[in-house]
Amino acid sequence: MKIKRTQEIDQFFNRCLHNIQNESKNNFLGLVVSKETEKDIQKQMKKAGFFEFQGDSDKWPSLFISSNDYMNRPYHKTIKLEKIISDEFTYQTQMVNANELFSLSSIQFDPKRELNDSMRLVALDEPMEVTILYQHNEVWMLDVPSEAETIDPIAKKAYGNVLTFGLGIGYFPFMAMLNPNVKSITVIEKSKSVIELFNQSLKPQFPNNIPLTIIEGDAFDYWKEDVLAQYDSVFVDIWKSNDDGLDLIEKLLESYLPQYDKVDFWIESSCLEIMPTLILMYFESISRNKHAKTYDKDYQRILRKIDAYFKKNDQMIEDVNSLKDFMYDMKLHRKILSIKL
């Protein structure tokens, strides 16, 4: 692929590079907000580039979410984590302060597609007690609003025979069971201890309206075309955060690239947040007949995959929208990551 440097494309590159370097959004994490200061903070967030505050101020979303609404979600009303009895797993409760901004969802991609991607920051309207689960005295699972916010939409869109990788405290299977379009749920879980914990303490509290099957096994042993073909929708949740998510998603996709619409990866936009930036770096470099480079060895490997993909494309790109289409195509992100070098 070749890129013709035009004034429009140069200006686009400059805007993207400016957005990459703008870290002012991070300054709002943990900021204390009240009903009295909410509007002023929203104005500051607008100035920092949060795109949800760029339009008419009357339509700006509130910075507050209801603690009561979260605690009254079906899982929390039904499942009592204090019933967990295990020598290996323990739990503690901790109060989360109200009026402090935290990230609720996975990364939201810039509607203008110019790398002004951002977190959705909100605060609880009242203090809330959350559960922290430990395995061998190390934090294993946090029962916090962001977990529900990032899993509920996937449970609602699931249908037919569902396969999920990763059991945890069973939040996804529980919510998927409430979906009338789901016929059965199969879970692949590597840890025998997690399965025993679930079967002993949590499964008895679950509804039994549809079959729930738990298989002890490694995700990579079941991530195969013939296995996934037996299911209608697939959800993968085997990483702790976006820190290890990109690496695991890449390894899975190198093993097998499934149909895009059939599979959801937990917090995929956060795990793959770097992809639009790396593609932009590649485009900017080849427009100058240079090779894109980064000091991060993992990102450099992905740049090599990006190069391998676009080398097969003999297009001459002369417009910004074509570049944006490539940068923000999540189906393309998966395809690039699936390339074996």
Task: Give the ranges of each region predicted by the language model.
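A short acidic, amphipathic alpha-helical/loop segment
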Residues: M175-A176, E225-V227, L248-L252
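Short polybasic amphipathic segments
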Residues: E129-Q135
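Short, conserved loop/helix-junction motifs that constitute active-site signature segments
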Residues: N179-P180, A229, S255-Q259
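SAM cofactor-binding core of SAM-dependent methyltransferases
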Residues: L142-K203, G217
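N-terminal auxiliary segments of SAM/dcSAM-dependent transferases
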Residues: M1-D125
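S-adenosyl-L-methionine
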Residues: S191-S233, S241-N242
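C-terminal substrate-binding/active-site "lid" region of AdoMet-derived donor-dependent transferases
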Residues: K240-K340
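Conserved beta-strand segments of alpha/beta enzyme cores
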Residues: S184, P211-T213, K262
